[in-house]
Amino acid sequence: MHCPFCRHPDSRVVDSRETDEGQAIRRRRSCPECGRRFTTVETAVLAVVKRSGVTEPFSREKVIRGVRRSCQGRQVDDDALNLLAQQVEDAVRATGSAEVPSHEVGLAILGPLRELDEVAYLRFASVYRSFSSAEDFEREIQALRAHREVPAQS
């Protein structure tokens, strides 16, 4: 790794620690040339494969933007959206794959969104699952009600 101060092409790792709940590694480095220290953070790149075949990096911001549209007019704050995006990223990373189809990202959004706000969930699901009739909404509402009743019976 190049030193950001003197551009020397090598550096020595002084300390390494996991951060971000094991999703990243923070390394403290020292430059043998100028002696200055600096920190780097390493994360595994997670790519999303779109339907068209195009690959792009996973983006929490993109998840938040998509979910925010579904939450318009609802009492959902930014902290809740950030937490949802983190849950989605954790679920997608848990697959162990470096490349994940966009379809799986959508599936990973549905669960946490259902728990966050049912109306936003219905809005998102209607687009994600391409609802084309009132019956599609009715089926999804029935599934929501059934999901609500299952934990109560436990």
From Swiss-Prot:
InterPro entries: ATP-cone_dom, NrdR-like_N, RNR_NrdR-like
Cofactor entry: Zn(2+)
Family label: Belongs to the NrdR family.
Keywords: ATP-binding, DNA-binding, Metal-binding, Nucleotide-binding, Repressor, Transcription, Transcription regulation, Zinc, Zinc-finger
Zinc finger (unnamed): 3-34
Record's keyword annotation contains Nuclease: no
Protein name: Transcriptional repressor NrdR
Cofactor binding note of this UniProt entry: Binds 1 zinc ion.
An individual GO BP term: negative regulation of DNA-templated transcription
